[in-house]
Design a protein with these regions (language model features):
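Short, structured patches in soluble enzyme cores that scaffold and shape functional sites
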Residues: 25, 41, 73, 122-124, ...
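Short, Gly/Pro- and small/polar-rich lid/capping loops
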Residues: 1-38
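A short glycine/serine-rich beta->alpha loop
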Residues: 85-89, 122-131
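Glycine-rich, flexible beta-strand/loop modules in the N-terminal catalytic cores of phosphate-handling
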Residues: 27, 32-113
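Generic beta-strand or strand-like secondary-structure segments
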Residues: 95, 99-103, 119, 138, ...
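Flexible, glycine/charged-enriched surface loops at secondary-structure junctions
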Residues: 7-20, 110-117, 152-155
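Glycine- and Gly-Pro-enriched alpha-helical subdomains that act as flexible
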Residues: 130-155
Length: 155
């Protein structure tokens, strides 16, 4: 079992021991789809929303859709207050947003999506390591639920 101390954080989980995972669907009522995802002590709220228009850079006569992602650590999600990022994502946050968005687009047929633009927001409520992987998983669940709702609505 791995046991080491890094400041005041002590990890006693074995290297091959899985973290507990909990998924609560439809956590927020206003999003197209939402997921409260817990992986160990990491907690993420992923919400899928539909934009009225495709991105400005998309061709006007586009028949395929687009999926984007946003990622944000809430100020109280880490052991010391995380400063909110203003005027767009920077550095680490931007890299994670791109990773999540590309992962989502790799798992969906944008042609089948039709001319819809979906954004999945991943808000980290508590960060305890593994936020990238947990965000991708939570975002994919929210995207899947959102697409299912669009299909059910006949869109």
């Amino acid at each position: 079992m791995a046991k080491f101390k890094d400041t005041d954080l002590e990890l006693t989980r074995a290297n091959d021991e899985m973290r507990d995972v909990e998924v609560e669907l439809n956590f927020t009522p206003n999003a197209l789809a939402s997921v409260l995802y817990k992986q160990g002590d990491t907690v993420i709220l992923a919400c899928c929303t539909r934009a009225r228009n495709l991105p400005r850079w998309f061709p006007r006569d586009a028949t395929k859709g687009w999926v984007n992602a946003e990622y944000s650590l809430l100020p109280g999600s880490t052991d010391s207050r995380f400063q909110r990022e203003r005027r767009g994502a920077k550095g680490r946050t931007y890299e994670i947003e791109r990773l999540v968005a590309r992962s989502l687009r790799a798992g969906i047929d944008l042609e089948e999506l039709g001319p819809h633009s979906l954004t999945v927001d991943c808000d980290i409520l508590n960060a305890d390591g593994g936020t990238r992987c947990a965000s991708i998983t939570a975002a994919m669940i929210a995207l899947r639920l959102g697409v299912r709702r669009l299909i059910d609505q006949g869109l």
